[in-house]
Amino acid sequence: MANKPFFRRRKVCPFSGDNAPAIDYKDTRLLQRYISERGKIVPSRITAVSAKKQRELARAIKRARFLALLPYAVK
């Protein structure tokens, strides 16, 4: 009995495609989704964000932290 190997479907980047949200450092509700409960940036292999958009996202999160819109760490 031959088993087929488990096929994991590739997730699609939430920031690519039509009517995708723009990455903006002032949009804290959107950025909060990509930060862990400890305040760290969640890696793209978990969130399925493309490499280019992950860099934009990280830059926006760091900008928002600098302007005190988001916390650096959560206790």
Swiss-Prot record:
Key words, A-Z: Ribonucleoprotein, Ribosomal protein, RNA-binding, rRNA-binding
Any one of the GO CC terms: cytosolic small ribosomal subunit
Protein name, as recorded: Small ribosomal subunit protein bS18
GO molecular function: small ribosomal subunit rRNA binding; structural constituent of ribosome
Task performed by this protein: Binds as a heterodimer with protein bS6 to the central domain of the 16S rRNA, where it helps stabilize the platform of the 30S subunit.
SUPFAM superfamilies listed in its UniProt record: Ribosomal protein S18
NCBIfam families assigned to the protein according to its UniProt record, in alphabetical order: S18
Description of how the protein assembles with itself and partners: Part of the 30S ribosomal subunit. Forms a tight heterodimer with protein bS6.
Organism: Paracoccus denitrificans (strain Pd 1222)
Family: Belongs to the bacterial ribosomal protein bS18 family.
GO biological-process terms attached to the record: translation
Domain of life according to the entry: Bacteria
